[in-house]
Each structure stands twice: as structure tokens, then as C-alpha cells.
Amino acid sequence: MKALHKTSFWESLAIQRRVIGALLMREIITRYGRNNIGFLWLFVEPLLMTFVIVLMWKFLRADRYSTLNIVAFAITGYPMLMMWRNASKRAVGSISSNASLLYHRNVRVLDTILARMILEIAGATIAQIVIMAVLIAIGWIEMPADMFYMLMAWLLMAFFAIGLGLVICSIAFNFEPFGKIWGTLTFVMMPLSGAFFFVHNLPPKVQEYALMIPMVHGTEMFRAGYFGSDVITYENPWYIVLCNLVLLLFGLAMVSKFSKGVEPQ
């Protein structure tokens, strides 16, 4: 009898890359293949939010107190919020939507979750780049002060979105009502994400609590890269790294635990 071929680490990695790639294509076709407005919404949602913030800024006549470009302020906060919010929300339904694919030997529960989150992160990234490029081209906002620092902030928050999504998906699998509640909780968390304020403008006691929230550090870091020395920010990249590691470790452990009880349908 022939001995079973044991795949090496690199072979296993290549297989997983192909599996996730195939799942990504399936998600793209399923979500955007028949209805292109779904793809367009990636750009429409942050633009609408920017428009609302600009209108509020003008209505409150806040330009009398600050010379900050409000369009740049909005567009450097909301798309990042949209990335982690949507990635974690989409992770919740990833298993039920792909349960039939688990019959395939190489498709794992983790792959189905990662594919959905990667698609959301990629979509938010494309939206951020395109919108900023257009706004710079038409002269509504200036070029970023430090694009590399912005990129580092975005990558850190992308890993945060993955870790958060793994944890939320695991909780929702074990406690189904939480999956429905999480959508509402993300709206409650929006004002706390740092997308609509600078930590520097908060009272000192409130600043301490705000800086306990990892999303605030990500937004502050992203805006520090865009505005440069024009604004005062309080980000700590190492705090985001620590939070990411904790979320990823807990998330992977939780997914590994409940995956054993998932049966193909």
C-alpha cells in the first residue's frame, strides 16, 4: 500500500492560497455578478457620509473655529471605520453561506471566513484609494504628508478587522442571536471609533478612555499620516499591534475549537 503523501508547510500554504482565491472569486461573482450597484456602494457610502459631515460643518459654521479641511477629515476616518465594521459583519454569515463547500477536503471553515473578510478589506481599500485620488485631482483635498505612515495605519487596521471578525464569527456561531445584535452594536461603536473626532479636542479625562479603544489609535495614525504637523495626534502603533495579536490568537483558537463541530450541508 502506498504511503499517503505528507504536504510540506509551503505546499499547504500554496493549497490554502488557491482555496481562498477560489472562494474570493465565488464571493465576487455571488455579490457583484448580477447587481453592480453592490460594487458601486463601496464608493457611494463613504461619499454620502462625507457629504453629510460637510453639510453639518457648514450648518454649524464650524469653519469659524477651525481651518481644517473637513472633506479630508471625513474621508480619512469613515472608510477605515467601514472596513472593520463591514468585515466583522460579513464574517458572521460566512459559514452558513459556504457550508456545502466544506465537503471538499481542502476547504476549511477558516478559509470561508477569511475569504469574506479579505473581500471587504480589499473593497474598502480600493474605495479609499479611488476616492482620495479623485478628490486630490479635483482640488478638494491636498496630497498626504506621509503616505507610508498612512499605509502602515491601514495595514494595522486591516489585521485588526480580521482578528475582530474571527472573534465575532466565533461568538455568533455559539450564540446565534449575537450575530443579529452585532450589526446594531457596530452602529453604537461608530461614534467611539475616532472617525468623527480628534483625541486632542477631548477633555483630558475623556482622552484616557478614548485611547483604550484600538480603533481610535488606527484613525489617529491614519490622520497623522495625512495631515502631518498640522494636527496633534496621540496614536500608539504598538498598542494596535498588541490588540491585533490578542484578537488574532483568540480568534484563531475560537475558530479552531468550533470548526470541529461544523458539518457540511
From Swiss-Prot:
Transmembrane regions: 37-57, 67-84, 121-141, 148-168, 178-198, 238-258
Intracellular or extracellular location(s): Cell inner membrane
Molecular function GO terms recorded: ABC-type transporter activity
Domain ABC transmembrane type-2: 37-258
Gene Ontology BP annotations: lipopolysaccharide transport; polysaccharide transport
Keywords: Capsule biogenesis/degradation, Cell inner membrane, Cell membrane, Membrane, Polysaccharide transport, Sugar transport, Transmembrane, Transmembrane helix, Transport
GO CC term (a single one): ATP-binding cassette (ABC) transporter complex
InterPro entries linked to this entry: ABC2_TM (IPR013525), ABC2_TM_bact-type (IPR047817), ABC_2_transport (IPR000412)
Entry superkingdom: Bacteria
Membrane topology classification: Multi-pass membrane protein
Function, in words: May form an ATP-driven capsule polysaccharide export apparatus, in association with the CtrB and CtrD proteins.
Homology family: Belongs to the ABC-2 integral membrane protein family.
UniProt protein name: Capsule polysaccharide export inner-membrane protein CtrC
Gene this protein is translated from: ctrC
